[in-house]
UniProtKB/Swiss-Prot annotation:
Protein's recorded name: Methionyl-tRNA formyltransferase
Chain segments annotated as coiled-coil in the UniProt record: none
One Gene Ontology CC term in the entry: cytosol
NCBIfam families noted in UniProt: fmt (TIGR00460)
Amino acid sequence: MKIVFAGTPEPAAVALEHLIADERIEVVAVVTQPDAKRGRGRSLRPSKVAEVAEEAAIPTYKWPSLKAGTESGDEARAVLGDLAAQGVTAAAVVAYGNLIPKDILDVFEHGWVNLHYSLLPRWRGAAPVQAALAAGDETTGASIFRIEEGLDTGPVAAQLTQKIGLEDTADDLLASLTYAGRELLADTLVAMDEGKAELSGQDDAQATHAPKIHPADAQIDWSQPAEVIQRVARAHTPAPGAWTLLDGQRYKIGMLLPSDPADVAELGPGEVVASPKKVFVGTGTGPLEITRIQPPGKKMMEAAAWARGQQELLAGRPTFSARETGE
C-alpha cells in the first residue's frame, strides 16, 4: 500500500525507518515540521524525521501550517490531493505536532492513522507517557487510531499493553513503546488496506487527559510522599528534568531511590545530608537517596561526587526549597 508519513521528533523517525523497511508499505511522501533552531549553536536544523526521509530520497514537505487560506495550507491540499489520486490510501502519524484540519483528514481513503502512547481513552493529549508515570499506573501501552477533529478521540483500530517497570523513566518507556508501536502501526495500516481492520469508538466517560508538560510541572515538592516524588522525577526524565532549589538556584535531580529510614537520621522535607558514599533527602514520608544531581551551570554528576565538593554546605544540613530568589 502507498502511504504518507507525518511526524517530527526522534521517536517518529524510528517509526518511519520501520515503515520504509516494510516491503508491504511504500512511503511516497513525508510531512514534518519546518527546520528549527537546535543544539548549542542554535542553528537551523531539520527534524529527525526529515533527516531519515532525505536519506531515503523521499519527497519531504515542511509546511508551517495546514490552515486553509495560507500559502502552505493551500499547497498542502494540492499536494495531498494529488497523492490521493496517485493511489495513496492513508497517512501514518507519529508525533507530528501540527493541527490537521478536517478536510485534510478526509483526503485519504483510510484517513490519518496515529500511533499514540497510551491505552486510549486513558491519557489523551500531548504527554501520555509522563502522565502514566506520574499517576503511578502499573500498565500502559500504545493505541493506533484514526484521527478526527477531537483531541485523540478517534476510533481505535489496535492496542498493545506494556508493564511499567519500577525504575522506568519517560525516556525508557517512550523508547520501548516506540519500537513495539511501530510494528503495530505497520500491521494495522496493512490490515486497513486489506479490509481486515476493525475500528471501535472510544468511551468518552473513561477519558483522562495528559496536557503538555511545562518546566513548572517538574518541580519537586519535598513534602509529598516519597513514592510520589520518585514518580515525578521518573516522569520528567530526561526532559524537562525534575528540579529543586537550593539557596535560590536550580538543581536538577536524577534518579531517586528508596532508602531505609534506619540508614539515616530523621530528615525534614527537603533536608539534605550526605554520608561518605551517599546523599539523602527528606520527604513527607521518609528519606530518599539522590543518586545523580546537576548543579547550576554544570553537567549531571554522581551525587556522592557533588557532595564531596560541598562538605561545608552540607555540614549545615541545607534544605531544598520551593521558591527562587526574587519570587
